[in-house]
Amino acid sequence: MNREILVHVDLDGQPVFCGRLWTRSAPRESASFEYDVAWRTSRRGFALDPELPLAAGPFHTGRPIFRAFTDPAPDRWGQMLLRRAERALARREGRNPRTLTAVDFLTLVDDETRLGALRFRDAAANGGPFLSTGGTRVPPLMALSKLLAATTRIIADEETDEDLALVLAPGTSLGGARPKASVKDSDGNLLVAKFPTASDEWPATRWEATALELARRAGIHVPVFRLALAARKPVLLLRRFDRDGEARVPFMSAMTALSADDNQMHSYLDIVDALRREGAQAAKDLGELWRRLVFNVLVSNTDDHLRNHGFLHDGIGWRLAPAYDLNPMPTDVRPRVHALAIDDTDPTASMDTVWEVAPRFGLATKEARQIAHEVAAVVRAWRSAGKKCGLKPKELDRMESAFEHRDLAQAAK
């Protein structure tokens, strides 16, 4: 089936028409996009994707959809929810479930909670509501226990239709594989709630909170976060950094910025190049990125792939988004080898390699070593930070190999 989608970008709280997206499902999924002339010639207009430069089109791709539209689409958790919902609907209607396409995943996501500032309308609806609008609204914090219970049943493949209805709208818009949902606090701020699961080998939400606390102390920009208990289990709450009050902030993952695919090896130096090319304050953000590189090596946050780095558009250009998805990893589960190479080719955690690439970040040796020393001094207090986040002595011991290693001692010198 062919579809035409009207693409809007929210700027200062108002949707601005940006262009048209055409998708085709046969003989295989593909897409085309063309900017609206007004957007392309406006001072406020910007390219959604390096593969979609701000120029006359149309542009075509043999991929199911352009990378710019994969960022606001669901990842594994959200896709699983949408497939479950389609199965339930097909069962009620007495038919086989249909295969959801890339544009289905994109447009079935709840509009209120969709990542970033892109919004979509169906051209055939002649200016109808944004996709997808309606249904269950974003639940309040007081619904955490219900959301946790529903996600637990969904993971066990024992959910009811009511469970899907509760989780579908707030849960489909967020990336990653961990169960999560959007909720609102008493001030109306949009939050991400990350839930623990029965299969967690350690208290994952408490450890992520610990890593965020260490990063914050180390001078790294992180979202506002806290732990809350739901049914006596720790839920990690993070304020959405792609929202400024009610206004949406454009977001682009490093995966999109580099026109990359999951099966390709990339490096921190590729992100450096992207910041130099597209950044509104490249020098400042390169210093921040260097600090994050040191931190990731010292806490063994090895799952630092390109989807776990992102950029926010500030009206002038792209800025490094706050750090997110920070998760220490013990060496008996995974060696200290990062998803991204530190230099051009080597992903092995090593402060020796980190020192070597410092000039690529625009840092003199003295400044680079001072930053590393500051980060190391904070990371050395990982046990006290973990205790503050509710981790027990045995749980702290379980993660010791992620923190106590030669690189920490070397960075602290």
Positions of the model-derived regions?
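Phosphate/dinucleotide-binding and metal-coordinating scaffold of catalytic cores
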Residues: 1-306, 310-413
